[in-house]
């Protein structure tokens, strides 16, 4: 289950008083969405996925491994990288390497051992 790709948003040019987007509204994504997306993953994980083992995909604002780690701790079994690819095409490699090092520091052999590992 994919959790949060975009949320409805709008921007207005205050001088022309017109919408900045041709369709008036659009989807907010990237780093601005990240904290909202992490909370949504956590909510769905606690309500459904933890007990049902439903796979969750965290989406929104993954620019570095720490962002992916937040999704994993919140309950995501996978993480999608969109904006990060525009910023740096090597983002997926850097994220994977960072997650592997993090897992070792956490004392586990696999990143998957940290899914839903948020300590309240």
Where are the predicted features?
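Conserved, mostly hydrophobic/aromatic
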Residues: 1, 44, 71, 110
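Glycine-rich phosphate-binding active-site loops on the catalytic face of alpha/beta enzymes
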Residues: 2-10, 61-62, 67-94
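Glycine/Thr-rich beta-alpha phosphate-binding loop at enzyme active sites
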Residues: 2-50, 54
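C-terminal helical cap(s) of enzyme catalytic domains, especially alpha/beta-barrels
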Residues: 12-26, 85-108
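Glycine- and other small-residue-rich loops at beta-strand/loop junctions that grip anionic moieties
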Residues: 29-33, 57-61, 84
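Alpha-helical structural signal in soluble globular domains
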Residues: 43, 47, 74, 94, ...
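Generic secondary-structure signature for well-ordered alpha-helical cores
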Residues: 46-50, 100-108, 120
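A short, charged, Gly/Pro-tolerant segment at domain boundaries
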Residues: 113-120
């Amino acid at each position: 289950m994919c959790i949060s790709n975009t949320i409805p948003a709008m921007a207005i040019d205050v001088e022309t008083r017109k919408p900045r987007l041709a369709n008036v509204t659009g989807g907010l994504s990237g780093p601005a969405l990240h904290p909202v997306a992490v909370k949504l993953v956590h909510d769905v994980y606690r309500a459904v996925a933890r007990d049902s083992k439903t796979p969750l995909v965290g989406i929104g604002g993954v620019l570095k491994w720490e962002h992916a780690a937040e999704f994993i701790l919140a309950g995501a079994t996978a993480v999608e990288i969109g904006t990060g690819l525009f910023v740096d095409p090597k983002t997926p490699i850097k994220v994977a390497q960072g997650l592997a090092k993090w897992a070792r520091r956490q004392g586990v052999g696999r990143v998957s051992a940290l899914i839903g590992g948020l300590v309240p």
